Amino acid sequence: MQFSPPLQRATLIQRYKRFLADVITPDGTELTLHCPNTGAMTGCATPGDTVWYSTSENTKRKYPHTWELTQTRTGALICVNTLWANRLTKEAIQNEQLSELSGYSLLKSEVKYGAERSRIDFMLQADSRPDCYIEVKSVTLAEQEYGYFPDAVTLRGQKHLRELMSVAAEGHRAVVLFAVLHSAITRFSPARHIDAKYAQLLIEAQLKGVEILVYKAELSAEGMTLKEPLPMTL
């Protein structure tokens, strides 16, 4: 995926009200960006860090600029726009970059499923193969070389794991894919120090047939692609 038009660079002043961030451009102009991330953004929003933002052609938007990437003072790149995790996953599946998810003829998005009537991110279908249900999670929380999910207690994420276990019990493929959007992360682990219940459910889900995939995105201000499998520790 290529950014078009190219991203623009600025320096972060502050993030506030969850959805907004003030930045200053190289020529000294102050802008307010839309922040498409409602999470804690731990380590992703330090004042003084470099941010890369896009600009919408929609003149009716109150905040036409969107915060896409953070570049930390150590040089790490982080994709803070949570919408990209699904977009990159879809692109990677369609281009058959993810070997475990290749060979399907049909891809559907946002399909209702399960007893709790969740919406699955993707469902893959093919003749003579069980349907494959895929839930995508964005990973940006980094501690040393490890990436962790979630960065806050997630009841919604817990529900998704329960639904995936039900899907696996019915004979379908059930997959949770952790999309690592932080260049410094080289391994993945559930954040039991933040949400012990989610970590416990993830282990239970694997034991009950849910497949766990971890793929890292190659990030730059020019574009991104999801392609590198990472090891995990549950």
Curated annotation (Swiss-Prot):
Gene3D superfamilies: 2.40.50.580, 3.40.1350.60. InterPro entries: SfsA, SfsA_C, SfsA_N. It comes from the Bacteria. Pfam families: SfsA (PF03749), SfsA_N (PF17746). One of its GO terms (molecular function) is DNA binding. Belongs to the SfsA family. PANTHER family: SUGAR FERMENTATION STIMULATION PROTEIN A. HAMAP family: SfsA. NCBIfam families: sfsA. This is Sugar fermentation stimulation protein homolog. The gene is sfsA.
